């Protein structure tokens, strides 16, 4: 069916007033490309679930695409039941527009299919969903979130019984089930209140959240308590309750919350891109820092799985990168656990192929087996699962992604800004007793192991034409691999689609350059972007940064 025919079908079938208004606005715009973009494909379900722009259409996040996906999941769960009791589902949602509506839509569809769901009664962080899926023994977890995307987006992440985002085999099976569902005629549903009354939609009790916070607290390091002043912003998301509770539990009570970003608000009125990686999102927090002079600024993204920090350096506040915080945390956790006698024999840490190489000498310093996996925290969770199968999960000490995601402990199998915030504050308190802040501590590591600079440059390609351009860029690199970049010889070209080092196939290309420099290119798994990762090494910070500028300019030529 072509886009205009699909549009006409939706006009006939849709009864939701907001979606009806959206459909009407499309027609009144007089721009056929608007209709085409909303209907040229069905929102793709993958290992990251669904993610897309809110609105009417098959390529949009709405109650019909959510209903279709949930019906597919219900069919998958019931198909696994083998005439027994079907598995249950844990459901969580963030502060985004329609997140609660989509969570209740999912619970209603599951209920109509005879499947019980456990739903958080209020918004909670992503790691609380990963934990609840495991704690409640659920077959599937559903988290309605689009992480740190702009406000026009929402998403629908799916987790397996281990608390990890689903593997490709399960995603493929669910996709097959979804594709056989007509989103208007085949989706079984019932009112959420009726699902509750029938005992099929059950609110998660407070004891589950308490158990999650207990598990987070178990990862604290023993240290002398001392004063620490923190400015914290949840960026209008889910982090406020859990982060402040865990900080108070470790004795950090001097917490100044950024008022205009404290309440859940899916419009994200203070920053269009609520991403703790970027300075714009932290400007309100930095303004408060100028008034109260804290030891550090903490910022969690809307679903509180990522955390960014800033600390004072001279007259300004410096943002530390995800790689820098990951290296600092690895060093701190290993140092403290070694001093406390709790570092396990043959400890294991995990990061991804796009994270800094600076972790390698730091890990070696403590005798840590540093493992690298593909991008996506589920692969870090997979290493934990492998250790668990060998009855060795206590060997896992830390995992991180360069995109500001960290995990200590095995209570969750996704990145956890709650446990990371706790450990960052403990780390800041430790260095404060030495007369340093975290920025200064990072400079010490650079001086010890060399100045590594890492930079991620993203190129956006919207719509159907953008998807074709992204595919063309990757095909071009494969068909004619670069022999040099900005005059630096490519010493090794790796195509992860062919399998590298025993890792699963992935649409990632790596160019290893002379003198320890590197460029990696991959399409984002959650946004219409191509990401270029730059890794440079220099005898000074400025030298490494200048080289990254040169490589960035050279790669920009190909992003058209």
Region locations from a protein language model:
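N-terminal small/polar loop signature for handling phosphorylated ligands or for N-terminal nucleophile
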Residues: 90-153, 249-309
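Phosphate-binding and adjacent anionic-ligand microenvironments
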Residues: 290, 294-296, 316, 336-522, ...
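Conserved phosphate/anionic-ligand binding catalytic regions in large, soluble enzymes, centered on
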Residues: 39-59, 146-149, 234-246, 302, ...
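An N-terminal, well-structured beta->alpha segment
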Residues: 7-106, 198-228, 238
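Short acidic, glycine/serine/threonine-rich loops at helix termini
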Residues: 100-105, 130-134, 152-158, 179, ...
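Gly/Ser/Thr-enriched, mixed-charge loops and adjacent short helices
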Residues: 14, 18, 34-39, 43, ...
């Amino acid at each position: 069916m072509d886009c205009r025919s699909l549009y006409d079908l939706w006009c006939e079938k849709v009864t939701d007033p907001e979606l009806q208004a959206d459909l009407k606005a499309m027609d009144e715009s007089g721009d056929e490309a608007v209709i085409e973009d909303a209907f040229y494909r069905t929102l793709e379900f993958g290992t990251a679930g669904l993610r897309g722009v809110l609105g009417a259409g098959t390529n949009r996040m709405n109650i019909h695409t959510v209903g279709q996906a949930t019906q597919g999941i219900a069919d998958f769960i019931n198909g696994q039941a083998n005439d027994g009791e079907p598995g249950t589902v844990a459901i969580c949602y963030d502060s985004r527009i329609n997140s609660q509506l989509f969570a209740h839509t999912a619970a209603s569809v599951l209920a109509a299919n005879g499947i019980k769901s456990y739903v958080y009664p209020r918004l909670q962080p992503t790691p609380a969903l990963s934990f609840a899926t495991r704690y409640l023994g659920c077959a599937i977890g559903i988290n309605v979130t689009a992480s740190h995307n702009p406000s026009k987006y929402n998403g629908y992440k799916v987790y397996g019984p281990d608390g990890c985002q689903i593997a490709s085999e399960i995603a493929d099976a669910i996709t097959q089930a979804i594709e056989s569902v007509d989103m208007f005629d085949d989706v079984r549903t019932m009112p959420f209140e009726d699902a509750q009354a029938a005992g099929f939609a059950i609110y998660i009790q407070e004891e589950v959240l308490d158990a999650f916070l207990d598990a987070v607290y178990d990862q604290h390091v023993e240290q002398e308590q001392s004063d620490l002043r923190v400015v914290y912003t949840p960026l209008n998301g889910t982090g406020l309750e859990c982060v402040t509770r865990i900080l108070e539990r470790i004795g950090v009570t001097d917490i100044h919350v950024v008022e205009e970003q404290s309440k859940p608000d899916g419009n994200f009125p203070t920053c269009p891109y609520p991403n703790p990686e970027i300075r714009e999102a932290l400007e309100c927090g930095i303004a408060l820092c100028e008034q109260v002079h804290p030891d550090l600024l903490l910022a969690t993204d809307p679903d509180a799985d990522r955390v960014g920090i800033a600390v004072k350096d001279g007259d300004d506040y410096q943002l530390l990168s995800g790689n820098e915080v990951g290296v600092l945390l690895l060093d701190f956790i290993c140092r403290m656990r070694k001093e406390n006698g709790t570092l396990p024999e043959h400890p294991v840490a995990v990061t991804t192929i796009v994270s800094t190489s600076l972790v390698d000498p730091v890990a070696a310093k403590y005798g840590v087996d540093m493992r690298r996996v593909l991008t996506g925290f589920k692969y870090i969770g997979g290493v934990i699962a492998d250790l668990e199968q060998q009855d060795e999960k206590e060997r896992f000490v830390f995992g991180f992604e360069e995109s500001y995601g960290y995990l200590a402990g095995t209570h969750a199998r996704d990145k956890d800004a709650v446990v990371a915030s706790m450990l960052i504050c403990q780390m800041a308190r430790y260095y404060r007793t030495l007369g340093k802040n975290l920025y200064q501590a990072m400079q010490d590591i650079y001086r010890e192991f060399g100045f590594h600079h890492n930079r991620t440059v993203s190129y956006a390609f919207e719509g159907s034409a953008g998807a074709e351009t992204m595919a063309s860029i990757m095909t071009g690199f494969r068909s004619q691999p670069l022999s040099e970049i900005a005059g630096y010889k490519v010493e090794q070209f790796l195509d992860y689609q062919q399998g590298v080092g025993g890792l699963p196939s992935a649409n990632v290309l790596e160019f290893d350059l002379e003198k320890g420099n590197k460029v990696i290119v991959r399409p984002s798994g959650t946004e219409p972007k191509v990401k270029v990762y730059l890794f440079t090494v220099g005898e000074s910070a400025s030298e490494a940064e200048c080289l990254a500028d040169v490589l960035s300019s050279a790669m920009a030529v190909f992003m058209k």
